Structures are given as structure tokens and as C-alpha cells.
Amino acid sequence: MWTPTEEEKYGVVICSFRGSVPQGLVLEIGETVQILEKCEGWYRGVSTKKPNVKGIFPANYIHLKKAIVSNRGQYETVVPLEDSIVTEVTATLQEWASLWKQLYVKHKVDLFYKLRHVMNELIDLRRQLLSGHLTQDQVREVKRHITVRLDWGNEHLGLDLVPRKDFEVVDSDQISVSDLYKMHLSSRQSVQQSTSQVDTMRPRHGETCRMPVPHHFFLSLKSFTYNTIGEDTDVFFSLYDMREGKQISERFLVRLNKNGGPRNPEKIERMCALFTDLSSKDMKRDLYIVAHVIRIGRMLLNDSKKGPPHLHYRRPYGCAVLSILDVLQSLTEVKEEKDFVLKVYTCNNESEWSQIHENIIRKSSAKYSAPSASHGLIISLQLLRGDMEQIRRENPMIFNRGLAITRKLGFPDVIMPGDIRNDLYLTLEKGDFERGGKSVQKNIEVTMYVLYADGEILKDCISLGSGEPNRSSYHSFVLYHSNSPRWGEIIKLPIPIDRFRGSHLRFEFRHCSTKDKGEKKLFGFAFSTLMRDDGTTLSDDIHELYVYKCDENSTFNNHALYLGLPCCKEDYNGCPNIPSSLIFQRSTKESFFISTQLSSTKLTQNVDLLALLKWKAFPDRIMDVLGRLRHVSGEEIVKFLQDILDTLFVILDDNTEKYGLLVFQSLVFIINLLRDIKYFHFRPVMDTYIQKHFAGALAYKELIRCLKWYMDCSAELIRQDHIQEAMRALEYLFKFIVQSRILYSRATCGMEEEQFRSSIQELFQSIRFVLSLDSRNSETLLFTQAALLNSFPTIFDELLQMFTVQEVAEFVRGTLGSMPSTVHIGQSMDVVKLQSIARTVDSRLFSFSESRRILLPVVLHHIHLHLRQQKELLICSGILGSIFSIVKTSSLEADVMEEVEMMVESLLDVLLQTLLTIMSKSHAQEAVRGQRCPQCTAEITGEYVSCLLSLLRQMCDTHFQHLLDNFQSKDELKEFLLKIFCVFRNLMKMSVFPRDWMVMRLLTSNIIVTTVQYLSSALHKNFTETDFDFKVWNSYFSLAVLFINQPSLQLEIITSAKRKKILDKYGDMRVMMAYELFSMWQNLGEHKIHFIPGMIGPFLGVTLVPQPEVRNIMIPIFHDMMDWEQRKNGNFKQVEAELIDKLDSMVSEGKGDESYRELFSLLTQLFGPYPSLLEKVEQETWRETGISFVTSVTRLMERLLDYRDCMKGEETENKKIGCTVNLMNFYKSEINKEEMYIRYIHKLCDMHLQAENYTEAAFTLLLYCELLQWEDRPLREFLHYPSQTEWQRKEGLCRKIIHYFNKGKSWEFGIPLCRELACQYESLYDYQSLSWIRKMEASYYDNIMEQQRLEPEFFRVGFYGRKFPFFLRNKEYVCRGHDYERLEAFQQRMLSEFPQAVAMQHPNHPDDAILQCDAQYLQIYAVTPIPDYVDVLQMDRVPDRVKSFYRVNNVRKFRYDRPFHKGPKDKENEFKSLWIERTTLTLTHSLPGISRWFEVERRELVEVSPLENAIQVVENKNQELRSLISQYQHKQVHGNINLLSMCLNGVIDAAVNGGIARYQEAFFDKDYINKHPGDAEKITQLKELMQEQVHVLGVGLAVHEKFVHPEMRPLHKKLIDQFQMMRASLYHEFPGLDKLSPACSGTSTPRGNVLASHSPMSPESIKMTHRHSPMNLMGTGRHSSSSLSSHASSEAGNMVMLGDGSMGDAPEDLYHHMQLAYPNPRYQGSVTNVSVLSSSQASPSSSSLSSTHSAPSQMITSAPSSARGSPSLPDKYRHAREMMLLLPTYRDRPSSAMYPAAILENGQPPNFQRALFQQVVGACKPCSDPNLSVAEKGHYSLHFDAFHHPLGDTPPALPARTLRKSPLHPIPASPTSPQSGLDGSNSTLSGSASSGVSSLSESNFGHSSEAPPRTDTMDSMPSQAWNADEDLEPPYLPVHYSLSESAVLDSIKAQPCRSHSAPGCVIPQDPMDPPALPPKPYHPRLPALEHDEGVLLREETERPRGLHRKAPLPPGSAKEEQARMAWEHGRGEQ
């Protein structure tokens, strides 16, 4: 049975549970559960992750934890009973876990690894806390580390900042807003101080280090590597200050044996020291670790003599240094231990040994040398911080290693009480000694002893260095042959304090002989006492000691014999009468120098201090001694502090009147000395002395008297230094006074209490007197007052010991009240006064409610005065923060209500005014980045905001009621409401608190909404009816709107756990404010009309909030607005216009963030079904206009949604452009808002410019230009345009548009604008501008003829599915591709822009299922442009560069073809039933335009019969052959004729092996002719085209014969043989063919009479179809836009012989082979032999859209790119096609090519092909382009650019659009991307859906120096073949055919340019002259003819068609071409 649990309430899942039982709860390991019931080993409860789901789970899967249960029962809550920081770590790690993984996904790898490290650290620290084995200090340290890491992680993950106090999360309800603000500030600073490594070097979290923290260096010697000494060594380590040139620490001594190990075996691994007490100042000094190496052994290392074994000398060996600065830079963390190597150097001259370390540091390399590279000391260093107690506690392992404590010489910066030292540091400086009759100098050794007064040598009183035991004697090191040795060796003398007096030092000097005996001979000594007769010790100075002569026989047993002698010069002056007959005689020529430094807390070197302490010995000198006390150093005073104080008070008791003032001054001096930070730690010593040792019971009287006397004198004295010092010592003076009075009261049982109180009263009167003095003219008095005010708050605690709280408060109030107001004193005094008040508020006195009642009014008075005058705002805010903190803490007390009332009356208004001033200054400062003043910073704004919020939070109903009742008039109330609403608005607009201060921001919002609820009733009550005030109401509404839109209140974007926490604590404050807003709107009544349309935008912003309830509340307001305006104006145009404007501006300003994603659903609710604004509208009289309005706004929102989505993210430019065009059209066509339309024109133009779409940018700006007239009407300033006339603006626009057309190389579009401008300039006689514009126009003509331009590709894209943006959804577009962009690249671009889209694999129109699905489908294939201006393309004399422009510009129609079989399919010849389905697309606008793509407006579908298709295929092939042949016929040298070879080979080879023979079989068959009698004319036409092809091939072979390379002769012979076979196959069908090409006859071997069954050709059949015939004009050739891709046109086939069985069954098979029959040389790059491809060779590709082996680029033969990439051909033909299209097409720009090797049936490549390959590029190399597919990597990459010269550009022509003004009309959206084309640096590209081959560069066509050939087609067929030397056509004219060879020859020789000659039976027509001016662009085009489907084909075939593209002109040939054209034109007229 299930029973409720009593104890088991909370637990952690220790094993995951799948919940496989009924009612089972799925649990993950680590989750926490709340347990409700239990039953036989099972629990029932909920997971804290999903508190709404209850279930059961096994009890043994749960680890129980203690918890606090509140509200037991159904709604009980459980809080785990564990450390709050552990709970926080757990929750934080769970929150970080998901975010951490996202970092990896977003490629933020660095932060990913850092966060992982921190998370692991947190887990470890949490484990330490949970272990329960830590001390309190350790727990505190662990918590500090945890909080630093938590804050660091939250900061870097963008999470909320957590306010803390003592490492615990604070509850915002328990503290004041001011305190909460400071905690946020503190946490933020802590986070900023922590580094990415979570630095632990910063001060403890939440603490301020008042005292400097000492540093310590831990040094450990690892090893000393040396191999040449062979003797024991002493290594001395010390710290050396290079700047000061002195050692600052004791020495650390390590004694090593000759093997480098420690001499003492116990020292192994324990050679370590701690250099202590280094201050921060020391760490900034130029410090070095210096190591001196002293060897112990022979005098000379290389001395072979063996001296006595007992004699060892200390000899200098070497030195090493290490910079502390280098150490600190390498130690990145505190406590990090790191190894360093110190290289040891030896001294070149021993006399300079004392300076060797300086020389090494200075790098004076001439004075030292390195004995060996292997000499070095390896040490490890570690930096520690903190006092010694802390160091011992935190690093116990260090102290367990026999650590040597190495102290600083002298005291540290902070002298700690109880630090007892008595060390004398003696430095052996130098000596000067006589040679003593020797020829060489001496080797001098100094021996030193410490002797007591009785002559006893003191044991263990000499220390050479820490780390080794003390010794009784010291032996210096010996410098070889030096009579003036300089040692510089420091020795420490730790002499016991009781032995110091009477002790002396004796120095004995010996010469160490290097002779055989090696003895040491004594020759002199010196001595020095340690204390003088006056009791002072040896001074810290250099002392010169007298050297006395002696010898080995001299005895020192009787020390009195020499102690009576003077030891130095000072001593000599004290002993004037010294007998000369003493046993020891002074050597006057010898001297010895030592220096001493005393570090003692018991001994002094100061005579004055000794005199004070022994004043009773000389009582008459006491006045003098007290006067000299201030000259004693602070170190001496603090050492003897208690003794000095006792002495002073004894003197005071001895004679108060005589010594009182002097003792008072001395006491003040000592007290102020302890204010120095160096002695600050001695304040506790002083406190202890006062409490326990002070015994001056009568002292208080004299102290009060002196203090009062000082204050009374302050008005008169000019010098007040001593008075100011007394004021600074006020705290301790009062401590002495109070303690003295307590002692007196105890002794006398409280006698003289009244006198004491009276004296204190009088003292305070004097204090008030001092403060009341006018100090404006006296700087001295000002300093005195400042000193008094600074010290005044420190005496409160002392007074509270003697007086009640009220009495002390009265004292303080009187004192603070005596200060002059801020008007009368200077700024510096203001600061001091406020600081005094601040310390008063922070004192214990202010925490009592009794005292606050007394003090608060005077404190508020002073603050009010300062705030009114805007002075010292930062200090005032600190005081207010302290007051609010205290009031919040005491809020349960009854007196707090009264205090809050007092603060409201005094502060609320001035706080609001102050905040407004600060915010306005801050705003102005942001606008003008000038100097920063403290009052304008975010910090001070935050301080005052927190103060205001604290006050408002403390206010209750009563306070608000009193506040509102106290206003004397409505004007005052209005001013107050405006102020507070303005402050609240600024709070939300300025973001005073950072975004991650979520706790602070939520609390602020809660206070604001509560305050507004109180104030809204006053607003309604006072300003509604007759007293309506628009300004107040508007301010209120603006505030409410801002409040609801606050980012911090948008709960939808935060985690569910955080959302629940906020809702539990505050509720949804947006809903609360929305209800207030709606209620106030309803209260407005008829005044609502004042806010229409002004509040439409703000209220609309509120509805953007994705909160259903808020929308519910707000939507009726819109109906209200429409209703009220309808009543007033009879319409609601204003509402409509304003709504549209505001919606647009919100989007443009980027407002709304994520909520805009909800906008569309919002509007369907807002104006659609939701609370049914639409239903309300339908009930009104204005129903129709209302519904129209709703519809328009909904449509606008759809577009704004798309625009917002594109603009805000990392969307591609094409989407942004498309959205902008879409929106622009909407404003123009549907709403007719011209200003918005123009704005979006400029936005679109900017986007085009950014994408470098200059032509589109020009067309876009042209829209605005067309709206303007050439008038002088003034225009206002708009956008970036200044105020100017309409004429000026239009002129500027025209110039800019012309400039953009020039940059876009669209000169034809710019020329009409030039003419328009020229007309204007001419009418104004502005000849300068006219000249400029005419030159510009002329330069454009030059550019058209000379500069190279690329022809773009065009692609049809269908966007299907509901997931696409609105402007693309279920629509199809045609896109103008970028330069060099082929189908595959375009397709990849589209798929990358729509990563969710799926590419459709078929060209069929999608069904409704796809159109309505929630997905994205893309259907992409290439289309062929159908140019509108065919008349330009038909003109013979128009240069090809001009024609090429019209082929791809001003194009509105495009087509693509799909093959299919109609009727029964003939397996023997499938061409009979192969039809073409031709789709023509008509766009809404011509390309190019304002976008790179436009929507398809209309589709037309026609079918092309097999015969018509065959005619087009053969006709196009003939045209290509003529064009190519004409390019080669003018060459006079043997150039590269690969293209001609390939083209001829492809046609002849295909014809021999099937080619046109298939057409003969299909269409010349009797059965076909009989079945299709209507096709007779077409059959005749096909026959004529075949005859023409044979003739053209003959001409081509003649040209080939002329230029063929000798190595290619076999190929040429093969071509001639195959040509004869081809002619023979057609002989019986066309008997006249044998006479067509005699140049090729001779080896004619007819293959068979293929056409024998057909009737002979009629005489008419010999006529050649003119190239301008309707049939010929059906298709056009053109340049491709990409040099990286070759789009195989319909006439392009592959040079592959198809075997009889190679035809497939599908219509695509036949269509494919039809293409192969007539290969196009434009799409081939190599001559290939015949390769039989069977169906089994095809390698199907997986995708016709994405595969590199995609479908052939063209569906039919007549269109150059009509179906590029059409996915209609099956994959199985792709490889075959790529194999056959071997070399790239001709292009007008460089590229690379791909060549698959053709393989014969026997597997061997053909010889001619190999020869050609070698001729072209030598050996072929496999292509290794990583972008290629596996199939392509077997191809060969041939680069023709290396051996071909480039040709010129094709000159384009002028446009055919006009610049007339156009009305506003919609322009379709364009989804094209602005990205540039593919990088041209990649020389090899894979085949693609477009072609399967790469393009060939323009250099394939010979040398640029040659005249550009004409590429027009041949007019007629000559009866005889041409000679190979003759021209096929003259330059610049089409090829003409005559019926006789002589006519041809005559025409060629007689005239370089000839007119058209007509074929037989054709009357020649006059050639059409080119127009004088190019056709004007922009003229409305003729409407397309409407046809029936059956007639359409015929009519279309009769339409003229543009020519195929020609070879480009060479650069620089344009001028020559122009001259020839002019001459040619003249000849034509003649």
C-alpha cells in the first residue's frame, strides 16, 4: 500500500531507470527526484526536470539526501539541505552541459576546451566540499575558487551574472536595491579580473586588501653540474638590487662535496630556502638572484704541490645571476614551480671578485669568462603570497623539507607585533695592508670572533648563511696576491640580547703562504665593540677599524690589553691620552673597513630614545628629550611602543602643568605614526595597551584640556600644523580619555561624573566652534576643519561607552548641524563634509533607530542641498545607499515607516531631477565623445537608479497616498508624473544595467510596474475629464509600451527552469502592465482621438510580444482606433497609413528581434480570426474598407516578414535583394506610397553596389530618375540628397547612373542617357558639360568596339513548397548568371542559399502535392535567350561585338527543349519519330534590369517535327563550318589549326559513319514522302542544306590543306579519304556533287549508293539556303558567360562513330545520336578518332542536377544553349557525351580544358590523335584537380593558353530601350545572388550538367596581329571548288557563293569588299544599311503575335534569327575595322 513518506523526500538517481513497468518514471543517472510516497521497495514521485510527470521507480536506484520540507501535503516544496554553493554548482553544470556542446558545433573550439577544463575543476572542487574533511579556511578557499570559475563560465557563455556575498548567492528580497547593485558591480569586477585560466592571483572574492601582501620566493637547488673543480664548494644565494647596488637579503648557504652532492647526506633533496617578506615595491625593483661559488681547498687549482692536508683555503671560484623579472614573466600562476639554469662564470681578475655579479649583470664580458659550457646551477623557483602563517598553512610540504628561512636585511615594510629579532649584519668590506718587505703581495685571510666582556668566545654566534648551523669563528675567503683585498661578504651575528652589552668583535689577519709548509702567519688584528658607553649600538654605517701589529707569538688571552685601545677614529677622539709603550702598536699605513646593519626589536641606536626611557636619570633634560622625540625613526618607536607610552604618562602624572602640553604633543605624534601603513599593524598593540596596560587614571583631564585649548586656538593661530595633527589623532585621544575616565570611575566609584560630562559638552562646543568658522579665506583653517571632520566619526564608539545613544546622537547632530551649507564652502570642504556624513551613516551609532530618528533629518538636509546643486553626486549616492541598506535591514521595526516618509518628502523629487540631469548628460556625452566626467558615467547612473528604486521599494500604500495628497496643485502633480515616467522610460531605453544582470533588471521591472499601478489612479483621477493633459497620458502610454517590450521580460527566449523561477517570483509582468495599459485606454473616453494615429506604432510594438494574453488584451484597441477615426473623418486612412509606416520602420530599425518570427501568426490573429478584429470590422458600417485594410496590412506583413528574415541574419545578398524588390513593388503598386518606394529604391541600389552588380544598380536608380522632370521645382532634403532643384537632382542621378552603367560595361544603356544630358546641356549652352558628356559618349563607343565582355548564362529556377519565403513560393524565375558561372556552379549556389531545399530530378511541372507540402524543392536548368532585336542581328555589316550584346541583353523570352517520341518508334532509325517539345518563357521584365532575375509571366509550349529539327541541325552545322573556315582562310603562316581539324573530322567522320545518312534514310525514303506530301518543300530544303554542307566541307579541306602541319598530314589524308566516302554516299541522291569539290577529288571511293532509290536532285535543289533565311534564323549562336564551363549547344555533338547497334530505345537515345551526327567545333578541343560506343559503356549518374556528369546541355540542335542542363536526358548518356566532346569550345576568355582519351575498339588510342596531342601540349598529364569526380580524374587536362596568342574582343552594339519617363509600375523580385563568378585561377574543371567539357580559351584562334576574320555564313554554293590560296570571304563581309569559279576568283581579286551575290534564280537585293543611330532602348516592344499551336511553328520559323557568334576581334583592331567599314560602305553606295 502506498503511504506518504516522512523522511525520504529528496534523492539523487544513482542508476538510470527506463521506466519499463506500468506508471514507471524514466530517470537518468544524476537526476534529482522529489519523493511523495513509498511501497515495498518502490518510491512514487517526480523528477525535478519534469515536475508535472509523476511515476514510480525503485527505491534502491535512489541515494537519499536530507531536505527541508515546507507546506507538507499535496503542494509541498522540498529544498535540499546542503551547502547552497554545492546546489549552485550542480545546477550550473547541468545548464552548461548543453551550451558546451553547442560551442563545438559552432566551431568555438578554444572556448570549448577551456570550458571543459573549468567544468572538470568545478566537479573536483564540489567533490572536495562534499567530502566534509576541510577546515573552515580551506572551505572558504574552495568556495572562492568555485565562485570565480562559475562567474567566468557564465560570463563567457553569455549567461546571467550571479550576485554574491561571501560566496553565497544573495536573495534580492532580503537586501536593498543599492546593496544588490553593489554586489552585481563587485561580481562583474571579479569576473573581469579573472583570466581565461581563472587566475588565482587576484585578491579574495569580495574582500579588499587594506594591507600589502608580502611575497616570498621558494628556491630549491636541484644540482650543480661541474667537472673541473674537484674540491668541496660553498654556494651562497642572495637577492641583489642592481639599481641600489646592494644586497637586500640574507645569504642562503649550500655546502657541496667535490662530486656536487650535499656535504651533509641528510640534506639530499632538502637544499631549499624561502626568501621572505618581499613587498610589492621590492617586486618592481631590478632584483637578481645572485649565486657565489666558493671552493674549499688548495690556493691554486692548477698547483701540483700538495700542501698540508689540514690546510684548506676558502677561494673564490665563480658567480651566476638570474633576473627576477624573467622569473616573474615565466611564472604564469602563483605557486607554479619552474626550473631555471644559472650559468656559472669565473672572474678574470680576482681583485674584481667583489664586483663579479655586477659585471655579469652589466654583461661586461671582458671581466669574466665561462670555464666550461657544462658549468651551471639548476634551481627551481616558486612565488608565494600571503603572511607567513598563511604560507605555512597552505604549503605544509615545503616546510617539511628542512626549509631555510632567509629574511630581508632590515625590517619588512609591515612590522608585525611580536616579531622579535636581534640580528647584526656585518659586511667585510675591504682592507689595505703593507707588503711587509716581500717581493710579492700577500694572500690575506681574515678570522673573526665574537667575544664577551670577560674574554670568552661566544659560541654559535656567527652565521655565514641560512641553511647551515651557526659557528664560533669566521674565516674569510683568500684573494691571491692582493694587499688590498675587497671581500664584500655579509655575515650575520645573532648575538643573544643579554650578551650584547659588553661584547666585541676581533678580526685577525694572516698571510697564507703557498710555500711547502703552507702555514698561515698572523701579522695584525683589529677589533670593535658592539655597544657604546651611552647604551646605543654600533650605527648602521661603514666603520674604519685601526689595524694593530702582532705576530704568531702574540697572545690574546688578556683581552683588556687591546680593549683599552681605540678601535676606530671616533674611539680615538674619546681617548686622547694613550701611552705609546703598549704591547700592540697601530699600523698607521694599514686600515680595515667593515659595515654594520642592526635589525633588532630590543636594541636601539638612537640616543634620544634612550634618554626618554631613562628620563629619571636626567630630569632636568626632560623638556629637551620630549621635544626631540619626533626626530626618532618610526621603527625605533614601534619597537619600544609600550615603554615609551608608559614613560609619557608617568611624566604627565609627575608634573601635569609643566609637561602636559609636551606629553600631549608626543602622544599625538606617536598616534599619527601608527596611521602610516608600514606601522598600521601596531594599532592592535596600541589597543591592547589601552585596554590592559594603560594606567593613567587622571590623564583624561589633561587630554581634554589640551584638546579643547587646541580647538579654541584654531581661530587665531596662523600655523596650525600641530592642531591638525591633534585632529587626526582624535580617535586614539578619545580612547585614552574614555579609558582614563573608566579607570578613574573605578578607583573613585564614579566621582566627578558631572564635571566629566560638562568637560565633554564644552569640548563639543569647541568642535562646533571650529566647524562653524568661515574657512573660505584661510586654507590653514580649512585643513584643520577637514582633519577634524575626517576623525570625528571615529569617536562615536568611544562616546557610546560613556553616554546613551540619544546623547551621542545629539552630540553628532549638533556637530553636523554646525557645518555651513554647501553654498558657503568650497568644493574640497564639500567632499570632506560628505565623507564625514558617510562615515557617520556607516557607523554603529546610525544602526540604532533611536539615533536615526535624530540624525536622519540633518543627513538628508545636507544630501538634499548637494543634489539640488548637482555637487559630489558619487559620495551622495554612497550615503543614500548606506541609508537604504540600513532601512531595509530594519524594515520590520515600526520606526521605519516614519523614516521612509521622511526620505520620500526630502529625496524623491530631487532624486528624479538628479537622474534626469545625469541621463541627459550621459546621452549628450554618447553623442559627442568628449571628455568623461565622473557624473556622466554609467556607474553614477546605476548608483542613483538603485537609490531611487530602493526608495520606491520601501514605499507602501500609505507613503504613496501621502505623496499624492501633498501636492499643492495639479501642475505640481503633472510635473512629478512627467519626471518619474521619463526616468522610468530612460531606464528601459538606456539599459543602465547590463543584459546579464537579470536579477537586477527583473527587480527594477517589478518596482516600476508596482509604482505605475499606484500612480495610474492619480493620472486617471486628475487628468481625464476637463483637465485632460495629452503630455502626461502620452508619457504614460510610452512608458507602458517600453516596459512590455523590454528584452529582459521576454520569457519565451529563456530556459524553462529560469522561466518558472521568474514566474513563481514575479509573475508575467508584461501581462500586468498590459492590463494597466488597456484599463487606462478605456478610461480615456472621447480623448482617444488624441492618440490616433500617434500611438498606433507603439501599440503595434506591444502586439509583437509573443505572449498570447498580451495580444488578447491589446487587439481591441486597434478596432477602437479605427472606429474613432471613422467617426471623426468618415474613414481611417490615417490609421492605415500610420500602421504601414510603423511596421516598415520597425523592420528597418531592426527592432523586435526574435519576436518578428511570430509576426505573421500575430497578424492572422490580429486582423484575422483570432479575437476577431476582422469579425468586428465586418459588423461595422465601414466593412468593405475595413476588410481591404486588413488584407493590405496582412500582405505587407508577409513581405516584411521575408524582409526581416533576410536582413537580420547571415542571409545571402540575393535573398535580401529579392525581398527588397518585392517590398518596393508592394509600396508602388498596392499602396502607392512614393516616399517609401523611393527609400527602397536606394536600399536596393546600395545592395547592388555592395554586390558589385553595377548594371542592376544603374537600372534601380533609373526608377527614381524617371520620376523626376527637367524642371526647377525645389525639392526638400531627402535621404542623403541636400535641398536642391528637381533639375539638379535629376542631373546628379543621370551622372551617377551613367557611371554605374560604365562600371557594369553596359555602355549601350548609358549612351541614351548621355544624349539626354547632352540635349539638356545644349539647351542651356553649358558647353563645358556638353563637351564632357560627348566625350563620355564617344568613349563608350570605343569601349563597345574594343573592350572584352562576357556573355552570361541564363537559368530557370522553380521554387516549390510552402517553406520558401512568400515572394518565392511556388513561382519560377529566370536568373542571369554571374560571369564564369555555369549550371553546376549556379545550382550549388542555389542549394547553399537554401540548404533545406531538395533538387528535383526531372523537368516536369510539379503536382499540387509538392506545391502545398511543408518543404522546399528547387527545379533548375539552363535556358536560351531569344533576343528581341533580330534586325540588328540580321545586318551583315554590324560587328559581331555589337551583335553579341543584343543576343543576351534586353531579353524577355527564353526557351528550353525536351525530346520525345510521337507515334511508333522505328528501331532502325529513330530520327523518324523524334520530336522536340519547345517551351518558351516570357518574363515580367527584360534582363538585365533592377534585379538579376525576374519572375516568369507566361509559358508557351510548341512541338517541333523530326524533319524541321533535322533542317535546323544541318543548317546550324553549316553555319558553324562557314564561320570557322573563314577564320582560317586568311592565315598566311602555318598556325595551330586544331579547331578546324577537329570540326572537319567531326562532321566528315560522323557523316561517313551514320550522320546525315540517317536523315536520308528517315526523310528521303519514298514511304515517308508518300505519307507526308506536305513536307516536300522541307525535304527539298534539307537536301539543299546537305549539298551545301558537302561544298563547305570541300572548302574547309582546301584551307586545311594549306595550313596543315607536316606531322598532321596523315590526319589530313584520312579526312580527304573519308570526305570522298561521304560524297560517294550522297552521289546517287545528288549527281552534281562530284563537281563540287575538285580539290578533294582524286581519291574518291564511293562507299555505296545510299540514295540510289531517290529521284535525282532537281535544278532548284542546288540553290543554297541563304544564311538569313527564316530557317537559318531560328537559332543563334552566342558566346558563353563562363570560361570555366562549356555549354554544349544543340548543334554540338561528339566525334564518335556510332555502331549500328548503338542506338537506344528511349527518345533521348535518338536525340543524343542526332547531336553526335553533327559535332560542333565550338564544344570540342581535340581531333579524335572514331570511337564506337555501345550502350554498355554508359555510366549513369545519380543526379541530373547535382552530378558532375549531368545531362547534355542542349535538347535540340537549333538553339545554342536552349536546354543546358535540362534534366530530361537520362544519366546513361553523360559519360558517352563527355567522351565525345573532347576539347573545349571556343570562348572569348581564357580557361582550361578537359580531354578524355578516345579509345578504339582494340583499346589503343589513334595515332593521329596522339600526334595532335603532342602538337598541342606535348605529353598529356592526368588532371589532379581535387574538385573533379572519380570519372573525371582519368581525363587529360590540356592548356592551350600557353601556346596561343589572345584575340580581341567582340564589339557590342547599342541598346534598344528608351529613356522616356515611365509611370510607377511593379517590378518583380529577384532572388539572384550577387556573388562574383568562379575563380578563374582553376585551370581544370569537371564536366557538368551544362556540357560535360570545359571551354577553350580565346587563344585557340591564332595571332592577334592578324586582321579579324568575318564569321558570317556563305550565301550560295559555288559550282567549282576554291583554291586553297583564295579567300573564302573578304574581311568584314559575309562569304558569297557564285555558280562559277571564275566569278569567285574575279570577285576576290577585284575588290577587297564586295556586296552580296545572289544564288542562281534569285534576284539580288540591296544590302540593308546599318541605322544611323542605334535603336533606342526602353521603347515599348510590339506585342507577341498570337498563334494557334499548329500555326505557331511555321510563323516562328519565318521569324528572322540572329547569327551564330563569331571569333572576336583582336585588341587594337577596332580602329582598322572602323576605317574598313567606312570604306566598304562607300563602295556599296557606288
From Swiss-Prot:
Coiled coil feature spans: none
Tissues expressed in: In normal brains, it is localized in the neuropil, and occasionally in the pyramidal cells, while in Alzheimer disease brains, it is associated with neurofibrillary tangles.
Phosphoserine, modified sites: 1658
GO CC terms in record: cytoplasm; cytosol; plasma membrane
Record key words, sorted: Chromosomal rearrangement, Cytoplasm, Disease variant, Guanine-nucleotide releasing factor, Phosphoprotein, SH3 domain, SH3-binding
Region (Disordered): 1641-1662, 1734-1771, 1849-1927, 1951-2030
Subcellular location: Cytoplasm
A UniProt-annotated Pfam family: DHR-2_Lobe_B
Residue ranges of domain SH3 in the record: 6-67
Ranges annotated as biased composition (Polar residues): 1755-1765
Molecular functions (GO terms): GTPase activator activity; guanyl-nucleotide exchange factor activity; SH3 domain binding; small GTPase binding
Biased composition (Low complexity): 1734-1754, 1880-1902
Residue stretches of biased makeup (Pro residues): 1967-1977
Domain DOCKER: 1228-1635
Subunit structure and binding partners: Interacts with presenilin proteins PSEN1 and PSEN2. Interacts with CRK.
Family as reported in the entry's similarity comment: Belongs to the DOCK family.
Disease per record: A chromosomal aberration involving DOCK3 has been found in a family with early-onset behavioral/developmental disorder with features of attention deficit-hyperactivity disorder and intellectual disability. Inversion inv(3)(p14:q21). The inversion disrupts DOCK3 and SLC9A9. Neurodevelopmental disorder with impaired intellectual development, hypotonia, and ataxia: An autosomal recessive disease characterized by global developmental delay, hypotonia, ataxic gait, hyporeflexia, poor or absent speech, and variable and mild dysmorphic features.
Domain notes: The DOCKER domain may mediate some GEF activity.
Name of the protein this chain belongs to: Dedicator of cytokinesis protein 3
